[in-house]
Design a protein with these regions (language model features):
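Extracellular receptor-binding modules and their adjoining Ser/Thr/Gly/Asp/Asn-rich linkers
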Residues: 1-20, 24-28, 32-34, 41-43, ...
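Beta-strand initiation motifs
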Residues: 5-15, 58-66, 108-116, 161-172, ...
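Short loop/turn motifs that cap or connect beta-strands within the blades
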Residues: 12-21, 66-73, 116-124, 171-181, ...
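Conserved core beta-strand positions within WD40 beta-propeller blades
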Residues: 36, 88, 140, 198-200, ...
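Extracellular carbohydrate recognition
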Residues: 268
Length: 475
């Protein structure tokens, strides 16, 4: 089935206040089973408890449910991710000086959480600047966090249980500084889908030696994360800015984009970017490329930690950032794409907030179902606000019809490779989680679900949890 690219112009829309009170920390993820955006946060207006809110994205807007407490305990430095295999939200925050993990399942706009949070590491301290990412294809997640005054740590957690018994168990936490480098901060992490079973971990070091920005590949095995490869110094800046860097993965190019900010004395916070490549557990980077923004000083870019997301429909990245020049601070959004080993910045920047976006509390969550990005920020009034950004670029549109739909691939087929297609009268045996006896339809994006609304096309009936009889198969 062919796809024709259609040009779409990016746009931003009015911000909506989600929560009053001073916003302390926020993170978000997308629940692909329920097609919902989930934010977890800590806010002075809700006693600094761990709260969540669920949003439904429509065309150019988002409708939020009721903010609800996940835990009535003071919580700081939150982060979260979605685990597709388990269909669960995983949230972490510092409670009573420990990194605590909560596991929950979404239904409608309500999350049922396990009642007993788990310590990742039984060490008291000021845990902050944390990150959680999914280990795709497994029931696991990967965590990294900064512990003030000592080493940062990383670990692998396994998700299990149902209802109030949802929980996590954790492998041995590894010190990120075990290779002799100083304590890492502002961790940003993405899964390395091209290599598989490893994450790319970016961070900054702000100490007397080894200052600057770093990236490393961390291999995953069982419940272990390996930090043995030597990290690569991306920038040796003597004054790396706070609330940066950001890293996200492009599965089309099998590379990652890394954006970081350097505090240049007398000038301001200047943004830079590099493309990160991996071969096994060895990483390399392309040439450093200046960030391109707007205003009197186009390289001004700050508050961009956690605010870089990959947009699958356009194969580019969305970046939310704060720009500062002689006219003052404003919240802006733009896009960047990978060309070879070079970042290519868009010349289209949009203002979505007429004041500061503060303290790194700015998150971008991409919604693949509406092909829009959700921005959650700490605005100039210090409150939690959100907006929706329609990502500019070429959006593929399908020409699929009942007559040109041939069948289902019998397995994964790489680009330019050949493979077997199960056509009419045959059986496809590589599905998962099917409901026996239900009709299944191919959607416009190539996914297979029970949704029958046009332009979806009937492909066949599930005869087992893993098999579909394609149209008139009678075997």
């Amino acid at each position: 089935v062919a796809e024709t690219p259609v040009a779409v112009t990016g746009a931003t829309f009015d911000l909506e206040q989600i929560q009053t009170g001073v916003q302390n920390s926020v993170d978000g993820c997308y629940d692909t089973a329920n097609n919902k955006v989930v934010l977890v946060y800590s806010n002075a207006g809700t006693s600094e408890y761990l709260y969540y809110v669920v949003g439904t994205v429509t065309s150019e807007s988002i409708v939020w449910g009721t903010p609800t407490a996940a835990s009535s305990v003071i919580t700081e430095a939150v982060c979260c991710c979605y685990n597709t295999t388990e269909g669960k939200i995983v949230a972490m925050g510092k409670q009573s000086s420990r990194p605590k993990v909560f596991v929950g399942t979404l239904s409608g706009t309500t999350i049922t959480w396990g009642t007993t949070p788990v310590d990742i590491l039984a060490t008291n301290g000021i845990w902050s600047e944390s990150k959680l990412v999914e280990w795709p294809g497994t029931s696991k997640v990967v965590w990294a966090s900064y512990l003030s005054g000592t080493s940062s740590h990383a670990a692998v957690g396994t998700i299990s249980g149902t209802g109030t018994g949802q929980t996590s168990s954790w492998g041995t936490a590894q010190a990120i500084v075990s290779d002799g480098y100083n304590s890492s901060r502002f961790h940003s992490m993405c899964y390395d889908a091209g290599e598989g079973d490893q994450v790319l971990l970016a961070y900054k070091i702000q100490a007397s030696t080894n200052m600057g920005f770093w990236v490393r590949a961390c291999t995953l095995s069982g419940t272990d994360i390996s930090l043995s490869p030597t990290p690569l110094q991306v920038s040796s800046a003597s004054t790396p800015a706070g609330y940066t860097p950001a890293i996200a993965y492009d599965p089309v190019n099998s590379k990652a984009m890394m954006v970081y900010t350097v505090d240049i004395s007398g000038v301001g916070n200047y943004g830079y970017s590099r493309v990160v490549s991996s071969s096994g557990s060895t990483v390399s980077v392309g040439a450093e490329t200046n960030f391109v923004g707007s205003g009197t000083s186009t390289q001004q870019c700050k508050q961009n930690w956690r605010s870089l997301a990959y947009a699958t429909h356009t194969s580019n990245f969305v970046l939310c950032y704060e720009n500062y020049d002689t006219s003052g601070s404003v919240g802006m959004v733009t896009t960047v794409e990978i060309s070879g080993t070079t970042p290519v910045w868009s010349d289209d920047q949009a203002t979505f907030n007429g004041g500061e976006i503060r303290d790194g509390n700015n998150v971008v969550i991409y919604d693949p179902d509406t092909t829009q990005a959700v921005l959650a920020i700490k605005g100039s009034a210090n409150t939690l606000q959100s907006g929706v950004y329609r990502v500019a670029g070429d959006v593929p549109t399908s020409n699929m019809t009942a007559t040109n739909l041939l069948g289902i691939a019998a397995g994964a087929i790489s680009n330019t490779a050949t493979g077997t297609i199960n056509t009419w009268g045959s059986r496809n045996e590589v599905q998962t989680g099917l409901t026996i006896g239900s009709d299944y339809y191919v959607q416009e994006d190539g996914t297979i679900t029970t949704a029958s609304a046009s332009p979806a096309q009937l492909i066949g009936e599930a005869i087992t949890a893993t098999q579909i009889n394609i149209k008139d198969y009678t075997g």
